[in-house]
UniProtKB/Swiss-Prot annotation:
Bilayer disposition of the protein: Multi-pass membrane protein
Naturally occurring in which organism (per UniProt): Stutzerimonas stutzeri (strain A1501) (Pseudomonas stutzeri)
HAMAP family membership: FluC
Keywords: Cell inner membrane, Cell membrane, Ion channel, Ion transport, Membrane, Metal-binding, Sodium, Transmembrane, Transmembrane helix, Transport
Catalytic reaction annotation: fluoride(in) = fluoride(out)
Function noted in UniProt: Fluoride-specific ion channel. Important for reducing fluoride concentration in the cell, thus reducing its toxicity.
The encoding gene: fluC
Record protein name field: Fluoride-specific ion channel FluC
Record PANTHER family: FLUORIDE EXPORT PROTEIN 1-RELATED
Binding residue positions for Na(+): 76, 79
Subcellular localization: Cell inner membrane
Transmembrane intervals: 6-26, 34-54, 69-89, 101-121
Superkingdom: Bacteria
Length: 124
């Protein structure tokens, strides 16, 4: 358990630093489009989680610690959108279309509503 926690923490540090670097660079390139930095890290995270998922399926010998460092730590720090996308992809791949669409729609709408609620609470 300690080894896994350390691996996840190490991956998280790297993911955090990459997110900071990418967001800083993208924001400097397109300062009027604040959302592009988030889109960039989310899309990168989705690309990477798809790649890693396929790699881990093909290579079951990859250690749980490395898997945890990359998926939970690195991509978790880079973006949680990648995990959301993988969950939706797995639902689609398993033929659970209604659940996948409910998950995607509910997550997006729920996220927007939660962000709005947080904004409203902060303004009280």
């Amino acid at each position: 358990m300690i080894r896994m926690a350390f691996a996840v923490a190490c991956g998280g540090v790297i993911g955090t630093l990459l997110r900071f670097a990418l967001a800083t660079w993208v924001s400097a390139q397109w300062p009027r489009h604040f959302y592009l930095a988030t889109v960039a890290v989310n899309l990168l995270g989705c690309l990477l989680i798809g790649y890693l998922y396929a790699t881990f399926l093909a290579r079951p010998d990859i250690s749980p610690e490395l898997r945890g460092a990359l998926i939970i730590g690195f991509l978790g720090a880079l973006t949680t959108f990648s995990s959301f996308s993988l969950d939706a992809l797995r639902l689609l791949e398993s033929g659970q279309l209604a659940t996948a669409f409910a998950y995607v729609g509910g997550s997006v709408l729920g996220g927007l509503l939660a962000a709005w609620a947080g904004l409203a609470l902060a303004r009280l």
